[in-house]
Amino acid sequence: IKGIDEATGGRRRWDVGFHFGDWLALDGEGDDGFKGATEDGYIATAYYYQSADIVAKAAKLLGREEDAASYRTLADEIKASLQAEYFTANGRLALTTQTAYAVALYMDFAPEGSKERIADFLKEKLKVNKGYLKTGFVGTCLLNKVLSDYGNNELAYKLLLNEDCPGWLYAVNMGATTIWER
């Protein structure tokens, strides 16, 4: 965490250096299409936030109050940076990918009062995509949890049990035992 802070000059956004993005997402275009359409800096900063949040909680459990307070402050500052950079004043997420919505909800950094709206945007995005996931390694593992958390169990099951490409069961039915690369 300290290395990220040093590399970014304390800006609380991890948008420098190479990032894998939402590796192998199906919504990417161009030469870097394999990284998906979700901005690398958004994903990296989200994980920077989550890491600081986890360390703050762990330090508190271990009785390291000074470390807990320091990392809580850092996590709160990163969260504020995410909100300032990627959310409108009305709480609308500027990035409109399935992954962006899922990450904001799962990692719980969306502004208060906007979470249900973001969950609705995710649900609508999946409908527009005819119930198919467009996520890569980052977003895929979060989708069903987030959908279920926000009362969309039916849609979560539809994603899980989809036997058409690019559904999870398509790969299983084709004999896959690991996640496929393109």
Give the label of every model feature segment:
Residues 1-182:
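Active-site core of glycosidic bond-cleaving carbohydrate-active enzymes
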